[in-house]
Swiss-Prot record:
Extracellular side: 63-67, 129-145, 198-212, 276-294, 365-374, 431-435, 498-512, 1001-1184
Protein name: Probable peptidoglycan biosynthesis protein MviN
Biological source species: Mycobacterium tuberculosis (strain ATCC 25618 / H37Rv)
Compositionally biased spans, kind Polar residues: 561-573
Recorded GO CC terms: extracellular region; plasma membrane
Family according to the record: In the N-terminal section; belongs to the MurJ/MviN family.
Protein's job: Essential for cell growth and peptidoglycan synthesis.
Subcellular location: Cell membrane
NCBIfam families per record: murJ_mviN
Alphabetical list of InterPro entries matching this protein: Kinase-like_dom_sf, Lipid_II_flippase_MurJ/MviN, MurJ
One protein family per Pfam: MurJ
Domain observations: The extendend C-terminal region contains a kinase-like region, which encodes a catalytically inactive pseudokinase, and an extracellular region reminiscent of carbohydrate-binding proteins.
């Protein structure tokens, strides 16, 4: 057992939390390390079997099990369930951040392990006899010799568990993930040395001084020591003191009952292992090796499929079980059961049919001959079904432990071990072939887990008491039955084909190569049948998988096609498979719960819908965009699961206080300057025996909340008492929008409960104008609303691009339609702050952070929608803005105190659109409902579209000519000439239009996930001024003589391409490195810049910078030397200025001349969705 990185200490002394991109990078690194560990570990087992053969491998396998058995009994079994939570609590509560607790823990663990290691080495002959029985076929002296050399691993196995737990609580996951790889590499190297050492392994008699024996035993133990050494180095790098400190912490004593239960659980399970090994070793010399290798083969697909599924579901399942949220637990059980069954049942069918071929393909090498590989294959076929009950038992145990019922699993393990022992005792009497006994032992093991699953089901049903008396819903049962039927049909047909085609001859005559070919044929037979049956039965996971395959194929085709089509249409992307879930809010301090389910679309609809686009936001009229919303038709919703960080410029996760909106005018900051610790965890009953404070988590970028489920990425503002965050769902590897409700815990319970209840009702609104609510949680310090992440830009970012009026009002219709649907459902959207609103990449204005306060009403929504439209039109916010500033400037007001109409600010805004924005913002504007507002928006859009259509040019009156029967030659020639001129002009216009369209499409589809601008969102009409370069500021151009990359805190970014920023060619550019962290400055280094050396000392007037990135901020600095040592050696000429994609001009107020000008990137933006800045041209103008 290995500790889980589930809980992280939050005391001030703890290590800093990982940043958002660092988390993603570490997650991928851990996944890669796990894959390498499994590959090298299995290669090690195969090599060992091939070198030693089945009989000798049995001796080594039994001896190598002993250190794991002893370590599990002494320490490992209790460490994950007991020590890790206590360690996390110590780091939170202790003044020294848990340093003394860690020292006591390591001292106690080392003492116990040293004693256990010494005793186990001394008792090696007894332990071997316990495992082999009284009359084994396995070489007992050789096994004992190996045991003497391998049992010292007990010490390092136990310490590895301790060190992993300490590192995990410090957010250090790399070394624990790679340490097993080091162990496997050392073990493989040991096998190479074993082959190189001359002589033979002494078997009869066994000599402890035999070179090969010592190399194999000591080398294997050295690998485990190397694994622990890697962890110890990481411990020292974290400056964690391990100096001995004697004493037992009182917190450990409280967990004595649970520790006793865990030890008893492991002891009973190890009893079944001992009985199985004794019977296997008595039956045949190869028995233990086949018995153990069978289990290793079964764990390969389980580790890649079953563990992945369980890892996704178990964190939420544990939280809900700990919170005693029975409906949520039932929903999670149903989801986990469904995902487990649909992935493992086909795997079991394939392994059952192809078992003999699998054994030969994997192990028919060297001294592990074809006969032993065949028996191993038979064991795989007989015990493959074990995967399913094994996974279900793990699910059930997690629920019991989360509900603090450690003694209940004892009943399950007693049943499992009892059936397993009974079946193991019967195995030698079932078959007359001693070599097949190991296969029937695997069958007995599976029957034991099956019995445990059945007993666990009834115990869980009695404990949870589900409505209707069933833990699994009808939908889940149907999916399981369909999957079973499809797997049975596919397996039966594959077995018949295997017999009729004589595929077994491939294994018999071609060995492992023939077995691989045989498995390929079986897979080609089974896969189409499984796919056809599940797709015809409309299993949602199958349809989602089909969509994913289609998307992958299409993306590969598009990569080889023109650049203008290198991105899939959103409608072709597969959506996530979701399931209807029964949810309720956890009761706040004894209050009544809200029995409001979160409604989702049926899985079939979700799988069928995929990622459909909303109405496009363009300047041309669209009937679908206008009347679809009016009719209330259910529009497909975009799903934003891709990792795309949209950090608002200049936003800082500052404190949020709670003044009344009327008390703060637009742009005012709250007075509260400190945010206290905030606890976010599943609600549970207070501990009667402990008064320990709750787990406190500081709301800062990189912090983990909800037991590590969500990692905070970027703060997006807030309005009292709410905070808006972009976060990463680490379980599902997708981004989400988190709205923290009353994180400081000042609202009354009834107000908080009413807020969460109203927000829960928003989950029923299925409109593109409101982000889909995924979860609503009542925590110990407020509430948490989890919604889908809306890819695109904030309202302020999009307003800053000056979108066209027609595009703006068309984009607003999605939000108005969502408000209309919400008001009809009896709930308001609470559009009270510009930071709540985002513009999606599909051109929809969306309520991105749902959370409806009790005082919210439909009239406030109308004003909020009008204010959002007003902001898109003139880049001003017309309403009072409480909380954290959004970046929008306040609107100017007329003599009556009303915001000035947008048309008075910009004469190019159509009167109808301006009137809608102005009237909806005013309290007495006459717009009383969202449906009226939506209708006015559609009418204004239609009128604006008609006024933009050019009428025909009136021709001068021409006297009517007398009609003739046939045109004369002069008229015919003139008409022919005019026709040719018209065709030529039309062709020229068409060619220019096609070139412009290709350029626009290339920009849009070539950078969908990159920076935002008005053309990509379809919010701006093309104008001549947008493509023309800005007029040159006064003063002469100063051409730099040299440019170098200035990076005092790290390596220079692409120094060889620095000249491209001043070469006068906008098509070339200097790019920074691509950073994994979306905000690398100043966390990774303080920044990077370009040092431009001027031909002579010059008073700089303006600096023009052309960039392709979004969100980049630069400072203009001067230096006395071209190579200053630090950034402090330069002088700031202009403060940080946000750059827009395209041409930017920065005015420099410098009185003194300078010969060295530094363009310093203080904030890195994004280019094509990557954390990278791209500067194509820098032009310097002297002061006039």
């Amino acid at each position: 057992m290995r500790p889980s990185p589930g809980e992280v200490p939050t005391a001030s002394q703890r290590q800093p939390e990982l940043s958002d991109a660092a988390l993603v990078s570490h997650s991928w690194a851990m996944a890669f390390a796990t894959l390498i560990s499994r590959i090298t570990g299995f290669a090690r087992i195969v090599l060992l079997a091939a070198i030693l053969g089945a009989a000798l491998a049995s001796s080594f396998s039994v001896a190598n099990q002993l250190p794991n058995l002893v370590a599990a009994l002494v320490l490992e079994a209790t460490f994950t369930a007991i020590f890790v939570p206590v360690l996390a609590r110590a780091e939170q509560d202790d003044p020294d951040g848990g340093a003394a607790f860690v020292r006591r823990l390591v001292t106690l663990a080392t003492t116990l392990l040293l004693g256990a290691t010494t005793l186990s080495v001394l008792a090696a002959p007894l332990l071997v006899r316990l495992m082999l029985g009284t009359n084994p076929q396995v070489n007992e002296p050789l096994t004992t010799a190996f045991a003497y050399l391998l049992l010292p691993q007990v010490l390092v196995y136990g310490l590895s568990s301790v060190f992993m737990a300490i590192l995990n609580t410090r957010n250090v996951f790399g070394p624990p993930a790679w340490a097993p790889v080091v162990n496997n590499v050392v073990a493989i190297a040991t096998l190479a040395v074993y082959l190189a050492v001359p002589g033979e392994l002494s078997v009869d008699p066994v000599r402890m001084g035999n070179a090969k024996l010592l190399v194999l035993g000591i080398g294997t133990t050295a690998g485990v020591f190397a694994q622990t050494a890697v962890l110890l180095v990481a411990i020292r790098r974290e400056h964690i003191s391990l100096r001995p400190l004697w004493g037992i912490d009182q917190r450990l004593k409280r967990f004595g009952a649970m520790a006793a239960a865990m030890v008893l659980y492991v002891l009973i399970s190890q009893l079944g292992l001992v009985v199985g090994n004794r019977i296997a070793s008595t039956a045949a010399a190869s028995g233990p090796a086949i018995y153990n290798y069978t289990w290793l083969v079964l764990m390969l697909p389980f580790g890649m499929i079953g563990v992945t599924v369980l890892t996704v579901v178990m964190p939420r399942l544990s939280r809900n079980a700990a919170a005693d949220d029975t409906p949520a637990v039932l929903a999670d059980l149903s989801l986990a059961t469904r995902l487990t069954m649909i992935t493992l049942i086909p795997t079991v069918a394939f392994m059952t049919v192809g078992g003999p071929a699998i054994g030969s393909a994997l192990f028919a090498y060297g001294n592990f001959g074809d006969v032993d590989a065949g028996y191993l294959g038979a064991a795989i076929a007989l015990s493959a079904f074990t995967l399913i009950p094994y996974a279900l038992v793990l699910l059930q145990l997690r629920v019991f432990y989360a509900r603090e019922q450690p003694w209940t699993p004892i009943t399950i393990i007693v049943v499992i071990t009892g059936v397993k022992i009974l079946g193991s005792l019967l195995a030698p009497h079932i078959t007359g072939d001693p070599q097949l006994v190991a296969a029937y032992l695997g069958l007995a093991n599976g029957l034991g887990f099956l019995a445990g699953t059945i007993v666990g089901y009834y115990i869980l049903r009695r404990a949870l008491r589900p409505d209707g008396g069933q833990l699994i819903g009808v939908g889940e049962a149907r999916t399981v039955l369909v999957t079973v039927a499809a797997s049975l049909l596919a397996g039966l047909l594959a077995h018949v084909a295997d017999r009729l085609l004589g595929l077994s001859e491939l294994t018999a005559h071609a060995g492992s190569v023939g077995s691989l070919l045989r498995l390929s044929v079986l897979a080609l037979i089974m896969l189409p049948i499984l796919a056809a049956v599940t797709l015809c039965a409309r299993v949602p996971e199958a349809r989602a998988a089909l969509d994913a395959v289609r998307a992958r194929i299409r993306s590969r085709r598009l990569k080889t096609g023109p650049q203008t089509q290198n991105v899939l249409d959103q409608s072709s992307r597969p959506g996530p498979v979701t399931y209807p879930e029964r949810r309720r809010l956890a009761p706040p301090r004894g209050k009544s719960v809200v029995h409001e389910p979160i409604r989702r679309r049926p899985p079939e609809q979700v799988a069928r819908a995929g990622r459909a686009k909303g109405p496009e936001v363009i300047d041309r009229p669209s009937e679908n965009a206008s009347f679809g919303a009016a009719s209330g038709a259910e529009l497909p919703r975009p799903v934003a699961d891709e990792l795309q960080l949209d950090a608002p410029a200049g936003r800082d996760p500052g404190p949020v206080s709670r003044p009344h909106p009327s008390d703060l005018q637009n742009g005012d900051l709250p007075a509260d300057a400190a945010r206290g610790p905030i606890a976010f965890d599943a609600l549970r009953e207070p501990d009667r025996e402990s008064s320990a404070p709750p787990d406190d988590v500081q709301l800062v970028p990189g912090a983990r909340i909800a037991n590590g489920r969500y990692r905070l990425l970027i703060f997006h503002g807030g309005v009292p008492p709410l905070q808006f965050w972009q976060a990463l769902d680490t379980a599902l590897d997708r981004q989400v929008a988190l709205t923290f409700v009353d994180p400081q815990g000042v609202l009354p319970d009834d107000v908080l409960q009413e807020t969460l209840s109203r927000t829960l009702r928003l989950s029923r609104i299925d409109k593109p104008g409101v982000a889909r609510v995924l979860d609503v949680v009542h925590t110990r310090a407020g509430g948490l609303v989890v919604a889908e992440w809306i890819r695109g830009g904030s309202l302020q970012e999009v307003a800053d691009t000056s979108p066209s009026p027609v595009g703006a009002i068309r984009a607003m219709q999605s939000l108005a339609a969502a408000a209309d649907a919400a008001h009809r459902a009896g709930v308001a959207l609470s559009i009270d702050h510009p930071s709540r609103v985002r513009v999606s990449i599909d051109g929809d204005v969306v309520l991105a952070y749902p959370a409806t306060m009790p005082d919210a009403n439909p009239q406030d929504d109308i004003r909020g929608i009008g204010a959002s439209l007003y902001a898109l039109l003139v880049n001003r916010w017309p309403l009072p803005e409480a909380g954290v500033r959004s970046g929008l400037a306040p609107a100017e007001r007329d003599t009556a105190g009303q915001p000035i109409e947008p048309a008075d600010i910009d004469r190019d805004i159509p009167f109808q659109i301006s009137a809608v924005a102005a009237r909806s913002v005013q309290g007495d504007g006459g717009i009383r409902s969202a449906s009226t507002l939506l209708n006015l928006m559609q009418q204004a859009t239609a009128v604006a579209d008609r006024t933009e259509v050019l009428g025909p040019i009136d021709e001068a009156p021409v006297s009517a000519a007398p009609r003739t029967s046939a045109p004369n030659s002069e008229t015919y020639t003139r008409r022919r000439r005019n026709l040719l001129i018209g065709i030529g002009a039309g062709a020229a216009v068409l060619m220019v239009a096609l070139l412009v369209l290709a350029s626009v499409l290339s920009r849009i589809f070539g950078d969908v996930s990159g920076g935002l601008n008005k053309d990509e969102l379809g919010l701006n009409a093309p104008t001549a001024s947008t493509s023309a370069a800005s007029s040159a500021p006064p003063g002469s151009v100063v051409k730099p003589t040299k440019v170098t990359v200035f990076s005092p805190d790290g390596g220079a970014d692409n120094p060889g391409e620095a000249d491209l920023a001043i070469d006068g060619n906008p098509a070339t550019s200097w790019k920074t490195d691509i950073y994994t962290d979306p905000v690398p400055f100043p966390s990774f280094k303080n920044g990077v810049g370009l040092m431009l050396q001027l031909p002579q000392a010059t008073v700089v007037g303006t600096v023009a910078i052309d960039v392709a990135s979004t969100g980049t901020k630069v400072e203009i600095r001067s230096a006395s030397t071209p190579t200053p040592a630090t950034l402090e050696d330069t002088a700031v000429l202009t403060s940080a200025t946000a750059l827009r994609p395209g041409h930017n001009t920065i005015s420099v107020e410098a009185a003194a001349p300078t010969s060295n000008l530094l363009v310093w990137i203080s904030t890195l933006g994004t280019t094509d969705g990557k954390s990278q800045a791209d500067i194509s041209e820098i032009t310097i103008y002297a002061a006039s």
